[in-house]
Amino acid sequence: IPPDQQRLIFAGKQLEDGRTLADYNIQKESTLHLVLRLRGGMQIFVKTLTGKTITLEVQSSDTVENVKSKIQDKEGIPPDQQRLIFAGKQLEDGLTLADYNIQKESTLHLVLRLRGGMQIFVKTLTGKTITLEVESSDTVENVKSKIQDKEGIPPDQQRLIFAGKQLEDGRTLADYNIQKESTLHLVLRLRGGMQIFVKTLTGKTITLEVESSDTVENVKSKIQDKEGIPPDQQRLIFAGKQLEDGRTLADYNIQKESTLHLVLRLRGGMQIFVKTLTGKTITLEVESSDTVENVKSKIQDKEGIPPDQQRLIFAGKQLEDGRTLADYNIQKESTLHLVLRLRGGMQIFVKTLTGKTITLEVESSDTVENVKSKIQDKEGIPPDQQRIIFAGKQLEDGRTLADYNIQKESTLHLVLRLRGGAF
C-alpha cells in the first residue's frame, strides 16, 4: 500500500508523518489502526441546534475527532464542547466516518455539551427513576420545571429531598453540592397537612403541623422551633423504630394524630471497651442512643472486621443490631465481648440422661445461652431448667463454645435442673 494512501490512527488521533512513535506515547504492543486514504474526499453537512448548517470537506477515513477539529476551525467551538449525532447515535472520537457508514452529503447533528452540564436522577416514592440533564447553576425551581415537562407534576406539588434535606426553590444545585449522577428523592406535597403529637420523656406532649411528605429532619426542625432542642440531640421513635433523618413520615406510615416519642441524645458520649477473643481490648467513643449496628460500624472502622462477622456479647446476652446500648443498660466503661461469626457453622451433639442424642447446628461464637435456646426450640425444655456439661465442667451462659474449646462433633451432656431444687 503506497504511503500516500495510508493513514495511521492511534488513540483516536491521526499520526503525522514527521513525528516519532515516542511523540505519541506509543509503547510496546500498542495497536495502531490503518485506514486507507480514499482518493478524493466528500462533502458532509453539520446542522446545529440553532438550525444553521455547516458544510465540511472530509474523507471516509477521517475520525470523529478530526471532524470536530474542522468544526472548530469553522465555528470556533472547542471539540470538548461538541457532541455529534448521526442516525440517533452519539459518535465516538476515535472511530471513523466509515465506521458509522457516513457517506457523501450525510447530515450530522451538532449538540453543544454544556459546560458544567451533567445528568442527575430523581427517584419517586413509587420507585420510578427519572433522568434529567441539568447544570450545577440550575435552580431547584428549574429542576421542578424539567420534572413537570417529563412527568406532568406541577412544581407546587413537588418536594425534592437530597441528603435528607428538603431543597428550596431559589437555591442552585451547586448550593447543595449536588453533583453528576446524584439521586434526588421526589415526594408529592399533599394538599393540606395534618397534626401529629410528639411526647417527651418528661411526659409533655407537643402538637406539630406536618405533611406526610415531611422528612424526619424537617420534623426535628419544627421541634427545635417550638422547644429549642437542637436536631442532633433529638431521637424520634415511632412503633418502636428510631426514625432516620432522610426518610419521610409517609415512609414510616405516620398518619394524622400519630404520636412520636422524643428521646434526647445525651451530649458528650461515653467510653466503652470491646474485648476480643485474642484478649485485645478496643476503646470506643459511643452514646447511649447508639444502636448495636452503629457500634459494629465503629469496630469495623478500627479493626476492619465486617459487621456481619461480628457478634457482641454483654452480660451473657448476644446483642441485636437494631437495639440501642441504653436498651441493654450498657453504661460508661462497660466491657462488651466480641466474637467472630465464623462463616459456616458446625454440628455438635447433646446427650440427655435418657440416652437420647440431639444434633444442633451451631457456630464457635454461639454462647451457651444460644445453645440452650436451640435445645428449647427442639425439645421444649426452658433454658433455666437446663444444665450443660462438657469435659466434666458445667458451662456458663455468657461464655461461648470457643471459650470451652468445643469443636465440631463434640458431645455435650444435658442435665435437668429440678424445679425448686438447689444444687
Curated annotation (Swiss-Prot):
Domain Ubiquitin-like: 1-41, 42-117, 118-193, 194-269, 270-345, 346-421
Cross-link for Glycyl lysine isopeptide (Gly-Lys) (interchain with K-? in acceptor proteins), residue positions: 117
GO CC annotations on file: cytoplasm; nucleus
Stored InterPro entries: Ubiquitin-like_dom, Ubiquitin-like_domsf, Ubiquitin_CS, Ubiquitin_dom, Ubiquitin_ubiquitin-like
Subcellular location: Cytoplasm; Nucleus
Propeptide: 422-423
Superkingdom per UniProt: Eukaryota
Molecular function per GO: mRNA binding
Cross-link (Glycyl lysine isopeptide (Lys-Gly) (interchain with G-Cter in ubiquitin)) at residue(s): 89
UniProt keywords, alphabetically: Cytoplasm, Isopeptide bond, Nucleus, Repeat, Ubl conjugation
CDD domains cross-referenced by the UniProt entry: Ubl_ubiquitin
Stored PANTHER family: UBIQUITIN (PTHR10666)
Function, as annotated: Ubiquitin exists either covalently attached to another protein, or free (unanchored). When covalently bound, it is conjugated to target proteins via an isopeptide bond either as a monomer (monoubiquitin), a polymer linked via different Lys residues of the ubiquitin (polyubiquitin chains) or a linear polymer linked via the initiator Met of the ubiquitin (linear polyubiquitin chains).
Miscellaneous note of the record: For the sake of clarity sequence features are annotated only for the first chain, and are not repeated for each of the following chains.
Family the UniProt entry places it in: Belongs to the ubiquitin family.
Protein name: Polyubiquitin
